[in-house]
């Protein structure tokens, strides 16, 4: 191939060299732009699901639902409305400290328990965090937030997630 290239006129060699360098620079700039755009979008998603999880954890109806020990219709209505108004959010789930699910965006999954161990840190009092986990609907980006009662004791946790 190099022999064919060398047989070309100087003008053709310069043209092909310039085009090759231009294509390489174009691909490099596109990959950098794509990478930064994906990173920015991921940060925006993380910010949104974390803020939503914090909001849900602060809802009085959610706290009273966990304190009473059974799902509450008013809390379900408020959470359903919240879920409908955030179409990019795929799952909101609320659990008590033993992992029993009190609310899930998909009603069929209410009453099940959380498995996976990702919740252990939040139940021990860590700051809210985001993980990438694998659930019944595939890979998810999940924001964990603890739910404290009026005394500050952790009585459960909320997960807000989007599918990857």
What are these regions (language model features)?
Residues 95, 148-149:
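Core beta-strand residues in small-molecule sensory/regulatory alpha/beta domains
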Residues 104-138:
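Extracytoplasmic/periplasmic sensor domains and loops in membrane signaling proteins
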Residues 59-113:
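Extracytoplasmic/periplasmic helical hairpin
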Residues 154:
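Glycine-rich acetyl-CoA-binding "A-motif" of GNAT/NAT acetyltransferases
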Residues 72, 137-140, 151, 159-164:
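Helix-start (N-cap) segments at beta->loop->alpha junctions
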Residues 4-35:
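Extreme N-terminal signal-anchor transmembrane helix of membrane signaling/transducer proteins, especially
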Residues 19, 33-63, 70, 74, ...:
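Membrane-proximal extracytoplasmic alpha-helices
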């Amino acid at each position: 191939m190099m022999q064919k290239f060398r047989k070309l006129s100087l003008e053709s060699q310069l043209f092909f060299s310039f085009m090759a360098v231009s294509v390489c620079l174009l691909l490099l700039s596109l990959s950098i732009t794509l990478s930064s755009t994906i990173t920015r979008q991921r940060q925006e998603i993380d910010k949104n699901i974390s803020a939503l999880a914090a909001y849900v954890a602060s809802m009085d109806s959610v706290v009273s639902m966990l304190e009473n020990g059974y799902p509450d219709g008013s809390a379900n209505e408020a959470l359903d409305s919240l879920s409908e108004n955030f179409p990019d959010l795929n799952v909101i789930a609320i659990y008590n400290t033993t992992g029993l699910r009190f609310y899930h965006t998909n009603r069929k999954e209410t009453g099940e328990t959380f498995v996976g161990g990702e919740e252990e840190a939040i139940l021990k009092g860590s700051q809210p965090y985001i993980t990438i986990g694998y659930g019944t609907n595939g890979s998810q980006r999940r924001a964990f937030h603890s739910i404290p009662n009026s005394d500050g004791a952790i009585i459960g946790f909320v997960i807000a997630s989007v599918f990857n």
